[in-house]
């Protein structure tokens, strides 16, 4: 029979059985806060990619902004916009190491498991917030050919075809492909109102399962996806309050110079992201008499290009073109006890190696050379000239463009050993105790080669000395800047887990857990653009000192060098200190319960948590605006609660609701600045401020009403589905001066089913709610991406 779109309370883990190498029981029987979504759940909630999971899962927030490169996942007060993720992702038991690969098409996905809270003992690094496990359909349990076609407003189209074939009792396979086109939602006023975010994507997947014997299974997967999209539709919001305050502290005043562009997207260059993503893997499972052995091998190749108009304006200032080429190979060997034993245990070894090659040149255009290099230098000279007895200096830069280049190789090696044991029915019936420990080793290194175009500049120096004056100048001096070197560091982590659980009835339990989480450190390669600017300044000063007509002038050279050393001292550059960010750690405490009530017609999942995080990683733009960096923010504290309810009210009507509350604040985050006398001055105190990008509340309320039609009707069933998704308040900055208030979007779907076919009419953001999906600040200016507007669509599914 055709699978019905129904949200009645059925045990998804029994209907969609997934072989997992590590867990011994169903997720609702374990001491963990988890949400399981079937393919029917995903259709009802219009989940087409990982970014559509926001709100459906309590305390999960994944802002939909930028491009496929930017998959920022926040759970329970922690998350990441760039570099290492705080939430892990596994697809068919194979880890996706790089978050640049997290956003992919869900055309063939059968089930998604979302585990909240640290999963470090069994899954290791970068799962301190939780874990998302994605499972594709098994051709052994599902046969036939699925065809899906869809169209929607804003010129959106998609089509997919997948064939599932069971050749014999020993071999089955599935193969298929998809294509999707997005016409774009947002317009660029600087480029004749062209759509900023239009995109095309396509790909294919193959999965083959071979059973050589009754106790041996070999599961092979290969998939490839290519996408080419416009992106980064950021509206200008004006001069920031923080920028005004900082200028005021320095006795300066900044005023709005782009008032006509507030509320508009206005880039002169088209920003885009292009990605090719190949994944393959082999799962081997051997069932012995007393244990199950699994060996999982994975390989991923990612090749992408991001082009970003990084001044985010209609002016021709500067842009960045970042290219990544990553190859990752992973291997995991797991031994676990067979289900039903009093002693349930899991022992494993895991390792991966990633080769990552990145190029990220920043190109200053003619206006950028003028405003950000020449004018900045002359502004500093004017400030010096305002002091009594100071010289007058001026600079002219001749470069029509200036490239601040960078080539980086950042390989990562990781290995781990782990064990977890659960003792069931300990002392009394239903009481279980779990203890586990993981030893995790990681080595990261960076080989960098950052070369900048030499600055071609003229310099004038004038100083009045009584009746005499010094007038010196030189033309076409050259100032290069380069960084070439290698850094490496390694970490050893112990990730323990303790849990106690009491089960008094099947799928009725309470539990308490204590776990330690860990997120990897790394290197900020985009920081080299900032360092290069500093090095260019030092290099220009050196060129002036070495000039035969200025610094080497026979009469005044020594005096000028001494004066310049006092007025424009060289800045020391420590590459390691400037580019390295430390690992993030957390201790996580949780109590919860899984309840099955009302004769199985009501499910309730409850949890409360407390997280103590140290060296929390935060993403922000560098002060120059030339790139994003990760910094460590001291300590933070997060606590909250979650509740999920599902009820089958009648045979026709089912309801569901989920709510999450998170209170995440900094407890030790103070920024100081060294003074000339050796003392430190507090420049920012964020203690007590809310952690950015973490909604205080998430809410999802949904329902379904299924009508079984009479035999004389055209349709067999009509299914009405609706859900309301909400989140907020969300603070966007550490200062907590910009935020998005609590907001919600209403979505609905109507399915008309006849035999093995179904046509669906749907709407997203039906009330056309206007809200900010993302906000950031750079160079004292604010930018925002709006949430997508109201959209209507129709889908056709057919199986034969």
Region roles according to the model:
Residues 34, 51-94, 110:
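Extracytoplasmic beta-strand/coil segments of soluble accessory domains associated
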Residues 336, 344-346, 350-352, 427, ...:
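Gram-negative outer-membrane beta-barrel transporters
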Residues 11-45, 70-72, 87:
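N-terminal periplasmic "start-of-domain" segments of outer-membrane beta-barrel proteins
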Residues 92-116:
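Short acidic/polar hinge/loop motifs at secondary-structure boundaries
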Residues 71, 85, 98, 107-110, ...:
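Outer-membrane beta-barrel translocator/receptor signature
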Residues 518, 655, 724-733, 748-800:
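C-terminal beta-signal and adjacent terminal beta-strands/loops
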Residues 283-308, 509-511, 536-631, 637-639, ...:
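Membrane-embedded beta-barrel scaffold of Gram-negative outer-membrane proteins
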Residues 141-142, 150, 166-261, 265-267, ...:
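Periplasmic-side early beta-strands and strand-to-turn transitions of outer-membrane beta-barrels
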């Amino acid at each position: 029979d055709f699978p019905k779109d129904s949200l009645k309370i059925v045990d998804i883990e029994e209907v969609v059985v997934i072989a997992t190498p590590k867990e011994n029981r169903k997720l609702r029987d374990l001491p963990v806060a988890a949400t399981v979504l079937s393919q029917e759940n995903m259709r009802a909630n219009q989940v087409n990619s990982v970014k559509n999971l926001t709100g459906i899962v309590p305390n999960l927030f994944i802002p939909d902004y930028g491009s496929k490169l930017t998959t920022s996942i926040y759970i329970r007060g922690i998350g990441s916009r760039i570099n290492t993720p705080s939430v892990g992702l596994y697809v068919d038991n194979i880890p996706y190491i790089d978050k640049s690969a997290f956003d992919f098409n869900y055309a063939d996905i059968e089930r998604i498991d979302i585990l909240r809270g640290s999963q470090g003992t069994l899954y290791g690094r970068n799962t301190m917030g939780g874990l998302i496990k994605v499972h594709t359909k098994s051709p052994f349990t599902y046969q036939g050919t699925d065809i899906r076609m869809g169209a929607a407003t804003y010129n959106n189209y998609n089509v997919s075809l997948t064939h599932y074939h069971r050749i014999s009792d020993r071999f089955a396979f599935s193969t298929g492909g998809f294509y999707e086109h997005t016409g774009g939602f947002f317009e660029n006023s600087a480029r004749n109102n062209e759509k900023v975010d239009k995109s095309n994507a396509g790909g294919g997947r193959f999965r083959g399962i071979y059973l050589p014997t009754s106790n041996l299974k070999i599961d092979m997967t290969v998939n490839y996806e290519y996408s080419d999209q416009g992106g980064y539709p950021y509206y200008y919001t004006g001069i920031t309050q923080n920028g005004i305050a900082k200028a005021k502290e320095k006795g300066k005043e900044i005023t709005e110079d782009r008032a006509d562009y507030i509320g508009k997207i206005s880039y002169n260059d088209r920003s885009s992201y292009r990605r090719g993503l190949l994944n393959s893997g082999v799962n081997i499972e051997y069932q012995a008499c007393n244990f199950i052995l699994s060996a999982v091998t994975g390989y991923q190749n990612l090749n992408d290009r991001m082009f970003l108009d990084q001044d985010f304006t209609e002016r021709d200032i500067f842009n960045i073109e970042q290219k990544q080429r990553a190859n990752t190979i992973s291997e995991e060997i797991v031994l676990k006890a067979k289900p039903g034993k009093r002693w349930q245990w899991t022992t494993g070894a895991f390792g991966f190696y990633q080769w990552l090659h990145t190029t990220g040149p920043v190109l200053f255009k003619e206006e950028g050379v003028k405003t950000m290099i020449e004018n900045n230098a002359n502004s500093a000279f004017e400030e010096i000239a305002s002091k009594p007895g100071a010289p007058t200096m001026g600079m002219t830069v001749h470069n029509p463009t200036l490239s601040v280049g960078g080539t980086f190789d950042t390989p990562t090696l990781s290995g781990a050993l782990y064990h977890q044991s659960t003792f069931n029915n300990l002392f009394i019936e239903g009481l279980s105790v779990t203890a586990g420990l993981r030893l995790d080793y990681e080595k990261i290194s960076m080989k960098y080669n950052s070369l900048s175009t030499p600055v071609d500049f003229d310099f004038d120096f004038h100083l009045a000395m009584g009746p005499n004056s010094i007038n010196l100048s030189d033309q076409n001096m050259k100032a290069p800047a380069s960084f070439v070197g290698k850094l490496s560091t390694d970490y050893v982590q112990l990730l323990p887990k303790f849990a106690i659980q009491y089960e008094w009835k099947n799928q009725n339990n309470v539990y308490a857990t204590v776990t330690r989480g860990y997120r990897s450190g790394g290197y900020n390669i985009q920081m080299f653009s900032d360092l290069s600017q500093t090095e260019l300044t030092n290099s220009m000063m050196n060129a002036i000192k070495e000039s035969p007509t200025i610094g080497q002038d026979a009469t005044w050279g020594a005096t000028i060098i001494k004066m310049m050393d006092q007025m424009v001292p060289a800045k020391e550059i420590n590459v390691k200190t400037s580019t390295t960010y430390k690992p993030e750690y957390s201790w996580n405490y949780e109590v919860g319960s899984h309840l099955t009530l009302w004769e199985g017609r009501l499910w309730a999942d409850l949890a409360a948590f407390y997280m103590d995080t140290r060296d929390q990683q935060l993403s922000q733009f560098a002060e120059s605006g030339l790139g994003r960096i990760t910094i460590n923010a001291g300590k933070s504290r997060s606590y909250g609660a979650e509740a999920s309810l599902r009820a089958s009210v009648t045979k026709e009507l089912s309801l569901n609701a989920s709510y999450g509350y998170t209170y995440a604040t900094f407890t030790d985050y103070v920024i100081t600045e060294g003074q000339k006398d050796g003392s430190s001055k507090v420049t920012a105190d964020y203690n007590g401020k809310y952690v950015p990008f973490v909604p205080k509340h998430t809410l999802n309320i949904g329902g379904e009403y299924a009508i079984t039609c009479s035999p004389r009707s055209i349709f067999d069933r009509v299914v009405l589905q609706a859900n309301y998704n909400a989140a907020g308040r969300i603070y966007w900055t550490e200062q907590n001066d910009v935020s998005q208030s609590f907001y919600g979007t209403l979505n609905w779907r109507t399915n008309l089913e006849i035999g093995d076919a179904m046509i669906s009419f749907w709407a997203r953001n039906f009330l056309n709610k206007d809200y900010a999906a993302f906000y950031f600040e750079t160079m004292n200016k604010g930018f925002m991406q709006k949430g997508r507007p109201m959209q209507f669509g129709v889908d056709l599914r057919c199986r034969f």
